[in-house]
Amino acid sequence: MKSATLLALSYLLIALYFLICEAEHSRYEEHEILEENMGDVVNLEQRSCAKPGEMCMRIKCCDGQCGCNRGTGRCFCK
């Protein structure tokens, strides 16, 4: 009984994490990048700047994919 309850709670926690993450992204993302970075055409070379679960421009990246412009240091979730 305890293991089933723990498993159910774990499942709910994971589902809640993804729902919150998707809700955050739907407000900011358009065409897979943040709106505030869409107009930036300088330094288009990107590098990874986030580990899974880290924040990127104050937004949690669901899968840890975060791109940065080298010159400006501005990041966006991919």
Swiss-Prot record:
The keyword Heme does not apply. Disulfide bonds join 49-62, 56-66, 61-77. It is found in: Secreted. Keywords: Disulfide bond, Ion channel impairing toxin, Knottin, Potassium channel impairing toxin, Secreted, Signal, Toxin, Voltage-gated potassium channel impairing toxin. Expressed by the venom gland. GO terms for cellular component: extracellular region. Residues 1-23 form the signal peptide. One of its GO terms (molecular function) is toxin activity. Residues 24-47 form a propeptide. Its main location: secreted. The presence of a 'disulfide through disulfide knot' structurally defines this protein as a knottin. Belongs to the hainantoxin family. 20 subfamily. Moderately inhibits Kv1.1/KCNA1 and Kv1.2/KCNA2 and weakly inhibits Kv1.3/KCNA3, and Kv2.1/KCNB1 voltage-gated potassium channels. This is Hainantoxin-XX.2.
